[in-house]
Amino acid sequence: MKNLLSMEALTVHEIEHLLGQAAQFKRGKKATFTEQAFAVNMFFEPSTRTHTSFEVAEKKLGVEVVSFDAASSSMTKGETLYDTLLTMQAVGVNVAVIRHSEENYYEGLENLDIAIVNGGDGCGEHPSQSLLDLFTIKEQFGTFQGLKVAIAGDIRHSRVANSNMKVLKRLGAELFFSGPREWFDESCLAYGTYLPVDEMVEKVDVMMLLRVQHERHSGTEAFTKESYHEKFGLTIERAAKLKADAIIMHPSPVNRDVEIADSLVESEKSRIVTQMTNGVFIRMAILEAILKEQEMRAKLCTY
């Protein structure tokens, strides 16, 4: 794997391999590389979980983390992202994890020697989040085939929804969508069925909630926090209708008492904290796959 830019670029075999490697890392597997590797985390949007779990993953792998602060970089002087990455490549950085507000920011960067991991591109995709979600689901159910998965909330503005709906359908899951119609893109119907939340909760094995992305709205939102929770959120009453073995997921950050009732965030059915934990192991698997391929290509070049 040279880069990780989108879920669509991964084959089912590659996905299964990454999930298997993540499981091994969770059981204590150690990675070894023939040469010292360097990574840089370039975040142009706020992040807590993605940024910190990539850094923890890098350090667990023995990868040196190169500091980067967008606000104090030469990009504030007009340097392009391409030239910034060219610099990182020139000084010996192996992989760049990038979070950016622009969708498809990585177009035109793929042919650089430095590997690129998409840490989220606007409303586009979030492949490492999607992979950790898959890892969490597989840990619970052992398969994706035939699972009923709900994606509920601010779907139109969610890169997580965009990644997950495509890959879950490929893996054999049945998808359901819910949330405000004005925040729903009809193109999603190619992947699943839209249902009112009260009808959906009784059907699904996985209830995947999405954050209301206030920063991507025009500022004229139609709902107060209280009205959103009442109409579309996972309330205590709705959660009581979930199947006995159903799980609750959320990519975080969570708006408590908006998408989900406060007391449900750390409840028995919730896998929200587990998702955060699993993020480290799946990101270790991603980085290992990229760095091992770099080692293999370097070895071939010596012959």
UniProtKB/Swiss-Prot annotation:
UniProt KW Translocase keyword: no
UniProt xrefs under Gene3D superfamilies: Aspartate/ornithine carbamoyltransferase (3.40.50.1370)
Residues given in the record as L-aspartate binding sites: 77, 159, 211
GO CC terms, sorted: cytosol
Reactions that this protein is recorded to catalyse: carbamoyl phosphate + L-aspartate = N-carbamoyl-L-aspartate + phosphate + H(+)
EC number(s) per entry: 2.1.3.2
Any one GO molecular-function label of the UniProt entry: aspartate carbamoyltransferase activity
Pathway: Pyrimidine metabolism; UMP biosynthesis via de novo pathway; (S)-dihydroorotate from bicarbonate: step 2/3
SUPFAM superfamilies to which the protein is assigned, alphabetical: Aspartate/ornithine carbamoyltransferase
Keywords associated with the record: Pyrimidine biosynthesis, Transferase
UniProt keyword Manganese, yes or no: no
One family name in Pfam for this protein: OTCace_N
Positions bound to carbamoyl phosphate: 49-50, 99, 126, 129, 252-253
One annotated GO biological process: amino acid metabolic process
Superkingdom, natural source: Bacteria
Subunit details: Heterododecamer (2C3:3R2) of six catalytic PyrB chains organized as two trimers (C3), and six regulatory PyrI chains organized as three dimers (R2).
Function: Catalyzes the condensation of carbamoyl phosphate and aspartate to form carbamoyl aspartate and inorganic phosphate, the committed step in the de novo pyrimidine nucleotide biosynthesis pathway.
HAMAP family according to UniProt: Asp_carb_tr
Protein's name according to its UniProt entry: Aspartate carbamoyltransferase catalytic subunit
Encoding gene, per UniProt annotation: pyrB
